[in-house]
Amino acid sequence: MAIRPLQDRVIVKRLEEERKTASGIVIPDTAAEKPDQGEVIAVGPGKKDDNGKSIPLDVKVGDKVLFGKYAGQAVKVNGEEVLVLREDDILGIVEA
């Protein structure tokens, strides 16, 4: 099953965070916070303006993005959890 976002929605796969502290202590899944960074895996066509024309999104597939801790809706696609976010929920693009 594939998912195609509508309007200004973006599908993001969370990036895995390190499960150890700097001193080597392993953090269990139950205590670890969900990461607030992810990779964009799909983008919608954009919001429609008053004339019905789509306004393209600033993010594109492959971008690494930052988002709020409680942003978006988590869904499972092919057994993998992804987030459905509005472009407004994205705080910024991480540049290497």
From Swiss-Prot:
GO terms for molecular function: ATP binding; metal ion binding; protein folding chaperone; protein-folding chaperone binding; unfolded protein binding. The keyword Cytoplasm applies. Pfam families: Cpn10. GO terms for cellular component: cytoplasm. It is found in: Cytoplasm. InterPro entries: Chaperonin_GroES (IPR020818), Chaperonin_GroES_sf (IPR037124), Chaprnonin_Cpn10_CS (IPR018369), GroES-like_sf (IPR011032). The keyword Cytoplasm applies. CDD domains: cpn10. Transmembrane segments: none annotated. Heptamer of 7 subunits arranged in a ring. Interacts with the chaperonin GroEL. Together with the chaperonin GroEL, plays an essential role in assisting protein folding. The GroEL-GroES system forms a nano-cage that allows encapsulation of the non-native substrate proteins and provides a physical environment optimized to promote and accelerate protein folding. GroES binds to the apical surface of the GroEL ring, thereby capping the opening of the GroEL channel. Belongs to the GroES chaperonin family. This is Co-chaperonin GroES.
